[in-house]
Amino acid sequence: MTVIMDGKKLAELRLIETKNDLLALKDKYQITVKLVIILVGNNDASLIYVNNKVAKAKAIGMDSEIIRLFEFIEEKKLFSVIDDLNCDSTVHGIIVQLPLPPHIDALKLFARIDSRKDVDGLNPINIGYLNIGANQGLIPCTALGCIDLLQYYVTGLKGKHVVVIGKSNIVGKPLSALLLRNSCTVTICHSATVDLALHTRTADIVISAVGKANFLTDKHFSGNLAFIDVGISHIYDLQTHKRKLVGDGDFLKIKDLVKFITPVPGGVGPMTVAYLLKNTLTAAKLIYASIIDNDNEKRLC
């Protein structure tokens, strides 16, 4: 029987752990950890995601703030906001909600955020630490969530052949690096891959992060160990006449062909939020440690 990998349940466990660590940090050092989320523009879906993050932060006793900015804000003004947050000692985590307006250079933006406060793990310094296998820096939240789901439900990742579909800087690349750190054999597939099914059907684990509704079907699977679905798409349901959330994989066609599978929603999404807050706690500890050490080279500004 196929096991549904319940991301909501596991995320709640991780949130409880983070809540307890926050309380301990506050009791010992009187630190109130704070996350700031910058939202550029009026994307309704982005606002829903941001509000969910704020609600989860509040539930575990973490301060948070949303900074809403005009869609057509000049890049230099956005960077100025980030510079101020970098220097603010009461702020421990900074993220800019994606997607961004096209006139904003995402790579320049990621590099602008202080790497110690980059709780999305997208600053080039953090990406560099991840790729060289250094035990420091902050790791992208979705990648951490996927690995946690696999380690929680699947016995042993070492030596497993994992096919990652998608090569984005947000999910595909950092996830592949983290899988390599866990001694997996990794194949990265993308839009130019010839005969995708040839790769997926022979994999132990398939992880898809494309954002294309239900494009993976039964033809792509054949008794695989696990399928992790990172993709999120909204489609119109002809039966209910409402929009619904689906993943990259056609769940009903795939679920009996794998031993473990994540649902959409309720799989990777909650884990991403849980690790965003866990990363913010980690960032606070790193920043406070540098203050205690009185390390001038590590001062915020």
Curated annotation (Swiss-Prot):
One of its GO terms (biological process) is tetrahydrofolate interconversion. The keyword NADP applies. Its EC number is 1.5.1.5, 3.5.4.9. It comes from the Bacteria. Gene3D superfamilies: Leucine Dehydrogenase, chain A, domain 1, NAD(P)-binding Rossmann-like Domain. NADP(+) binds at G166, K167, S168, S191, I232. Keywords: Amino-acid biosynthesis, Histidine biosynthesis, Hydrolase, Methionine biosynthesis, Multifunctional enzyme, NADP, One-carbon metabolism, Oxidoreductase, Purine biosynthesis. It catalyses: (6R)-5,10-methylene-5,6,7,8-tetrahydrofolate + NADP(+) = (6R)-5,10-methenyltetrahydrofolate + NADPH; (6R)-5,10-methenyltetrahydrofolate + H2O = (6R)-10-formyltetrahydrofolate + H(+). Catalyzes the oxidation of 5,10-methylenetetrahydrofolate to 5,10-methenyltetrahydrofolate and then the hydrolysis of 5,10-methenyltetrahydrofolate to 10-formyltetrahydrofolate. Belongs to the tetrahydrofolate dehydrogenase/cyclohydrolase family. This is Bifunctional protein FolD. It comes from Orientia tsutsugamushi (strain Boryong) (Rickettsia tsutsugamushi). The lineage of its organism: Bacteria, Pseudomonadati, Pseudomonadota, Alphaproteobacteria, Rickettsiales. The gene is folD.
